[in-house]
């Protein structure tokens, strides 16, 4: 049994890694949820029992319905080869309706945008716990500027260790997060023991009443703060590929109990200390419920938990981007697999981008209070889009229509209420995540629909049969009218069904300056689900100089095409599949393999293309994004090989039949 299969089973190690990777975001919500609710209602001096009981009831039932029911019980069943998240969900249902791509694009863009705010708000909140704390005669963190500096240092270090992989990080974070959740539960129950009557918050009636009660000064807008308790639910779904759903389902009950106890404990403390710190703007009930002799320990533990919360979003972002690339929502990117688990990935470009944006957000908002005002808006949009896709998934699984409609109406109503309340955050900072999400959405829209238009309008003869050109290529190899371009000309070209190839590849060989070579190689790289596969198959179509190579490489294998190809050439020469390539001038006596020239073809829009203005803009924007983001030489491990990048005209749509009219020569008269 291989590792991929084993990972699906629940184990103690798997549970520990799940606690370390998946629950960071939702596990740090107690740091700021009650603080936000109290602050929005005018501070601790203005709260009463009805507000606290109702608010905690809202929190408990929000986490129950959205996280437990929707994500743990329903969404985790909707995995695509073990991977979760909104893009994996879309991949499962996309054949049911073309329009489903819209919620997938919107939800994915919003989730990626929200991932830039989570690290900033969680780390800043935890470090603010140190602000003005005295150690003897010293105050190490006397101002918000020092908080910002420490926060940025922590974030930069966090992003720097991502290349180690989630397995290594999870093993380190798992035990710490287990301590964190246990600490939340113990502190919560210690404070709750002073007022067990607060357990009445379990009754959902209190949650409904507080929305219209005069004790709640912000009305339905309180949901904007309550929603912060469940923002990590979508990240939980996105991270399932890193730890498996069995380990998430097995660990969630303990996490849920610890979170619930902590919220109840904070509520109990607030009710018994209404006049405490009434004028302190930095008041945070999370740290106040902790005994003073444990305050420093709580802050240190909260800081580490905040770092892990950031990790949950970062790993989820890597997964989302990889899935987006495979679905042609985003350009291809360099993906690194730090472990033997295919679901555990690292994308250097995305890591750098999230790091830069997150640090910029810390500088822009400066305080956790301002960040909380912007937090959660984007994720409500993602949750709504996930609900739409889950409705279709349930239909695919044959669930009765009435159950699907109940599911859709119930969760769309709940999430719609949260969205309405979160919209008030737009002018207070929510616009930042909206702008980031909009930017990502534009890129994904252009890439996806640019590809769609290209595929739809591409000439019918865009693909040709390679075996129909073998005779012409053989003749070119022996034609002395042309100089030898290279001994081996290699095209990184996907050969479909072992015979179809894009015409532009043959155009590069034949229609431009003909490339005479001893052998023509067409190499296709296929990535397998096994980590260390290294196999190849060849088809020469009955020739000695036209070779279709299918490389099958495990996801952890380096794609060093030039290294593999030299071995393949030696083996094919040895068994007589191709002719030897003896070198007259060489520093290696007996060398029988010639030089290699790797050709990578890039598209440019041809003047012959005839598209509508919109179609032309989309295709040109898509080509521009491709040229901006891609480095094919690094994809294939050809950085140090003889690589040529050629531009080949891309002809789309109907050709213009006539450009200029021929006339008879005009007689010229002397002046």
UniProtKB/Swiss-Prot annotation:
Q: A Pfam family this protein belongs to?
A: K_trans
Gene Ontology cellular component terms for the protein in this record: plasma membrane
Per UniProt, subcellular location reads as: Cell membrane
The UniProt keyword set, sorted, is:
Cell membrane, Ion transport, Membrane, Potassium, Potassium transport, Symport, Transmembrane, Transmembrane helix, Transport
The molecular function terms in GO held by this entry are: potassium ion transmembrane transporter activity; symporter activity
- Main role? Transport of potassium into the cell. Likely operates as a K(+):H(+) symporter.
- InterPro entries, A to Z: K+_transporter, K_trans_C, K_trans_N, Kup
- Transmembrane segments in this chain: where? 12-32, 56-76, 99-119, 139-159, 172-192, 218-238, 251-271, 296-316, 345-365, 374-394, 400-420, 429-449
User: Which membrane topology term applies here?
Assistant: Multi-pass membrane protein
Q: Which reaction does it catalyse?
A: K(+)(in) + H(+)(in) = K(+)(out) + H(+)(out)
Protein name in UniProt: Probable potassium transport system protein Kup 2
Give the primary localization class.
membrane
Q: Which family does it belong to?
A: Belongs to the HAK/KUP transporter (TC 2.A.72) family.
